[in-house]
Amino acid sequence: MTKIVRSKYKASRRLGVSLWGDSKDAFNTRNYRPGQHGQNTMIKTSDYGLHLKAKQRLKCHYGRVTEKQFRNIFALAQKMKGNTGENFIGLLESRLDTVVYRMNIAPTIFAARQLVSHGHIKLNGKKADIASIRLKEGDVIEVKESVKQIPLIQESVSKQAQTTPGYLSFDVPSLTGKYLRVPALSDVPYPFEAEVHLVIELYSR
């Protein structure tokens, strides 16, 4: 886990934003790229580079989502009725690991994925161990009784009252939450500007 933490903080510096809004993020004190030439502000970024960086920021925010998975989610969003960008965000935000993270059951998207993959989360009363499961409105998730008291979960949920977004509900005493609705882009608490329009332009080329 330490290796993942170091790697994610390095990603924040490489991409020029705090990807998860973590107070421990090295980007907060060293807001330049890692490496010998990291503080060189004269390096120009091409139009393609700007589009690529917007995609990398969004993809990294969702943890270990592969490029193939990310593209497939985008392709599905294109086929759906309505705005492609809003559909894309709605699909990303309906993933089980994302919802566990947004409810602050886990402190990071990486820890959320581990809780799911280790079988510690229930979906509608049944064990769910696939991070990419897509939730529907009204779905209920809950932490398994056997792990409710572990420090990682208890420390994380202690912060939930201030930060649970409006498209989710969460009850701290029972560690049970509900997916209320598909969020709009403006509902999602990104700690950086999510330039979804640039991602759409990149994948539409």
From Swiss-Prot:
GO BP field: ribosomal small subunit biogenesis; translation
Signal sequence extent: none
Keyword rRNA-binding: yes
One GO MF term attached to the UniProt entry: rRNA binding
Keyword Transferase: no
Keywords: Ribonucleoprotein, Ribosomal protein, RNA-binding, rRNA-binding
Domain S4 RNA-binding: 94-157
SMART domains listed in its UniProt record: Ribosomal_S4, S4
GO cellular component, one term: small ribosomal subunit
Quaternary structure and partners: Part of the 30S ribosomal subunit. Contacts protein S5. The interaction surface between S4 and S5 is involved in control of translational fidelity.
Family: Belongs to the universal ribosomal protein uS4 family.
Matches recorded under HAMAP family: Ribosomal_uS4_B (MF_01306_B)
Role noted for this protein: One of the primary rRNA binding proteins, it binds directly to 16S rRNA where it nucleates assembly of the body of the 30S subunit.
PANTHER family reported for this sequence: 30S 40S RIBOSOMAL PROTEIN (PTHR11831), SMALL RIBOSOMAL SUBUNIT PROTEIN US4M (PTHR11831:SF4)
Protein name listed in UniProt: Small ribosomal subunit protein uS4
Species name: Rickettsia felis (strain ATCC VR-1525 / URRWXCal2) (Rickettsia azadi)
Gene behind this protein: rpsD
